[in-house]
Each structure stands twice: as structure tokens, then as C-alpha cells.
From Swiss-Prot:
ATP binds at G78, V79, P80, G81, V82, A83, K84, T85. Residues 7-16 have a biased composition (Gly residues). GO terms for molecular function: ATP binding; ATP hydrolysis activity. One of its GO terms (cellular component) is peptidoglycan-based cell wall. Residues 1-33 are annotated as: Disordered. Interacts with RipA. Interacts with host Toll-like receptor 4 (TLR4). InterPro entries: ATPase_AAA-3 (IPR011703), CbbQ/NirQ/NorQ/GpvN (IPR050764), ChlI/MoxR_AAA_lid (IPR041628), P-loop_NTPase (IPR027417). Displays ATP-enhanced chaperone activity. Required for the proper folding of the peptidoglycan endopeptidase RipA and its secretion through the TAT secretion system. In vitro, prevents thermal aggregation of MalZ protein and protects the functional activity of the restriction enzyme NdeI from thermal inactivation. Could be a moonlighting protein that uses a multipronged approach to dampen host-directed immunity for efficient replication, survival and pathogenesis. Can enhance virulence by inhibiting autophagy and apoptosis, and disrupting cellular bioenergetics. Binds and activates host TLR4 on the surface of macrophage cells, leading to the activation of the host NFKB and MAPK signaling cascades and enhanced secretion of proinflammatory cytokines. Inhibits autophagic flux via activation of PI3K-AKT-MTOR-ULK1 signaling cascade and represses apoptosis via inhibiting protooncogene c-FOS and MAPK JNK1/2. It comes from the Bacteria. PANTHER family: MAGNESIUM-CHELATASE SUBUNIT CHLD (PTHR42759:SF1), MOXR FAMILY PROTEIN (PTHR42759). CDD domains: AAA. This is Chaperone MoxR1.
Length: 377
């Protein structure tokens, strides 16, 4: 017996990676098919506006939006000069809200990012001055250059979504999203994120080089007067879209598939993957399962659906698991990457063939319904 949302009966709600409760029940967006089509059109406008500035990197732009809709944080890794920082700044400008940037350096201390109490001699009292972490969108540039105590302070804010200064608690504004960047090729003067802290990020996205055609377009587009991004969304729009994404339908068979994939990273020998057992020291936590479901729901909304299909789950699994797997020294010596492990698991765990559409929902994607209705007028 399953619930209306395709989850096993009695499963109840769960918490998204952002720590907010979400119900598994499926609720259609206000306005039905036309309402969903309008929301998807708004998301498409936002993506188009970002792509006016960022040439190529289509998956990066889409995953950043999915992370925002999922209330999860994003870790970007790539060599210098591939538009990691520009992508985050442009994205924050397009989706609205307050934006703050912290350039991490070895001499930072936690109060530099969180804030502190300042004594006002004229009034003979203390004032609380909040740090740059209090913003809707925070860019943590080169997060692996800051010492561990600064990283821990930031990642605690990411998880708890509030800061405590002088015995007072200050909540983070909503929505709250941290996008951190790091450079994988520098090993001197850096402080790699520990496994427990990497687990706080919903996605880890590897940002690669552009193609020759894309690089040529970058030169033409940025050569004279670089284009300026315009705001498309507001914070109210974001909160509404997050709620819509959280209510997207997920078939119980897909939930079971996600659980089996994540479990296979912990006990691969039970599925006959003895090679994976020698590669992985520690598998993914239940937070990864929650992240995959939340991200698949958001990706479905970006793609114009109010239900999740197997392809949505397959696409987000590598980005959710990539930074959560702890490989053995033997695997690192043999140049076994997390991608190799993830592909091996996906090839072994059978993907269910299910009817992903809710029985009491739409039989075809709502955007298609709206388009058909418009053409029939």
C-alpha cells in the first residue's frame, strides 16, 4: 500500500537537505497545467538570462538552479579561469535577493564571516555587527584556502541556518544558499574539506574547460562591452518554486531504487561488487538519499514536469554522490575516481521500469497539456 505521493504508507514526511520538512504527498501547482507552465516559463527565462553571460556550462547553470530549488548548497570545483565565480555572481543577480562574497584566505578567523560584538564607548554598550554570511546568496570563494576553524564556522551556518553571537541567535534569510568554489590543482597552502563537511553540500560539480567554439564565443561576447544580467526572479518567487518542487510526485519504486544505490556504496559485496568494496572505505550517508530525491524533484520541475522520471534520478546521482564517497588508498593509487565507482554501482543496481505519472495527476506533462490547449483554441 502506498500513499498518494508514491511513498510507502506510513512513511510520513522527511527533511530536505536544507533541514525543512516536506510532505511526500503530491499537490498540483495552483492553476493546474497552466500554472505549472507559467512557473516553468519563469525558470526558463532565468536560465536564459544566466546563459547570456555564461557561455557553455549548461549543466553547471542547471545544477545551480536545481540546488537552489532543493534548498541545498553547491560546491564547484575547477581550474582557475573557467567562470566559477562569474557564474555564481550572475546567478545571484538573476534570481534576486541579497548577495555576499567571501574570499577565503589563511588569515581569516570565524568572526570575519559570522560577525562579532563591538563596544560603543559613547553609549557604553555592545552592538552586534553581523558578518557577510548573512545573505540570501553567499559565494565562498576558494573555500579550501581557509583554516579548519573558519570552514567549520561556515558549514555550521549552512546546516543550522542561523548564527549565534553574544548569546543571541540570528536566523539566516530565506532562501539561503551557499555556493563554494575550490581549485583542485593547488596543494600548497590549502586546507581540504574533511569528509563530514563535504557532506553538507548537496552537489559537487566539476567545472571543465569550454569547447573551442564556446571559447571563441566568449571572446566575441566579452570583448567590447560585457553584457549585464537582469533580475528575473524575486525571493517570493523562489520560495514558491521551492514549495512546488518539494511536492513533485516520486514513485515508491524510484525511492526504493535510490535507497538500493546508496546502500550499494556501503555494502557493495552484497551485490557481488568485490572490486568496489576494495575501492570504497566509506559509502554515502542517508543524507545522500534525501539529497537525490530532493534534487530529482527539482530537476523534474526545471524540465517542465510535476513528477519524477527515472532519468531525473540517474542524472543527479553522480553530482550528489561524487563528494560523499571516501576512497581507499589503493583506489587512489590506482587512479580510481568516484565517477568510476558511481558508474559501476549504476550498472549493477537495476533501474525500475515504472509509470512515473501519479495516478490521480497528469497523464502527460502539464506543459504539454497547456500547449495543446492553447493550440486548440
Amino acid at each position: 500500500m502506498t500513499s498518494a505521493g508514491g511513498f510507502p504508507a506510513g512513511a510520513g514526511g522527511y527533511q530536505t537537505p536544507g533541514g525543512h520538512s516536506a510532505s511526500p504527498a503530491h499537490e498540483a501547482p495552483p492553476g493546474g497545467a497552466e500554472g505549472l507552465a507559467a512557473e516553468v516559463h519563469t525558470l526558463e527565462r532565468a536560465i536564459f538570462e544566466v546563459k547570456r553571460i555564461i557561455v557553455g556550462q549548461d549543466q553547471l547553470v542547471e545544477r545551480m538552479l536545481v540546488g537552489l530549488l532543493s534548498k541545498g548548497h553547491v560546491l564547484l570545483e575547477g581550474v582557475p579561469g573557467v567562470a566559477k565565480t562569474l557564474a555564481v555572481e550572475t546567478f545571484a543577480r538573476v534570481v534576486g535577493g541579497t548577495f555576499s562574497r567571501i574570499q577565503f584566505t589563511p588569515d581569516l578567523v570565524p568572526t570575519d564571516i559570522i560577525g562579532t560584538r563591538i563596544y560603543r564607548q559613547g553609549r557604553e554598550e555592545f552592538d552586534t555587527e553581523l558578518g557577510p554570511v548573512v545573505a540570501n546568496f553567499l559565494l565562498a570563494d576558494e573555500i579550501n584556502r581557509a583554516p579548519a576553524k573558519v570552514q567549520s564556522a561556515l558549514l555550521e551556518v549552512m546546516q543550522e541556518r542561523h548564527v549565534s553571537i553574544g548569546g543571541r541567535t540570528f536566523p539566516m534569510p530565506s532562501p539561503f544558499l551557499v555556493m563554494a568554489t575550490q581549485n583542485p590543482i593547488e596543494h600548497e597552502g590549502v586546507y581540504p574539506l574533511p569528509e563530514a563537511q563535504r557532506d553538507r553540500f548537496l552537489f559537487k560539480i566539476n567545472v571543465g574547460y569550454p569547447s573551442p567554439e564556446e571559447e571563441r564565443e566568449i571572446i566575441y561576447r566579452m570583448g567590447v562591452t560585457p553584457p549585464q544580467a537582469k533580475q528575473i526572479l524575486s525571493t517570493g518567487d523562489l520560495l514558491r518554486l521551492q514549495e512546488i518542487a518539494a511536492n513533485n510526485f516520486v514513485h515508491h519504486a524510484l525511492v526504493d531504487y535510490v535507497v538500493r544505490v546508496v546502500f550499494a556504496t556501503r555494502k557493495p559485496e552484497q551485490l557481488g561488487m568485490n572490486d568496489v568494496k576494495s575501492w570504497v572505505a566509506f559509502g554515502a550517508s542517508p543524507r545522500a538519499s534525501l539529497g537525490i530525491i530532493a534534487a530529482a524533484r527539482s530537476l523534474a520541475l526545471v524540465r517542465g514536469r510535476d513528477y519524477v522520471i527515472p532519468q531525473d534520478v540517474i542524472e543527479v546521482i553522480p553530482d550528489v554522490l561524487r563528494h560523499r564517497l571516501v576512497l581507499t588508498y589503493d583506489a587512489l593509487a590506482d587512479e580510481i575516481s568516484p565517477e568510476i565507482v558511481i558508474n559501476r554501482v549504476l550498472q549493477t543496481v537495476a533501474l525500475p521500469q515504472v509509470n512515473a505519472v501519479p495516478q490521480q495527476g497528469h497523464s502527460v506533462p502539464p506543459v504539454m497539456q497547456a500547449a495543446a490547449a492553447a493550440s486548440g483554441r
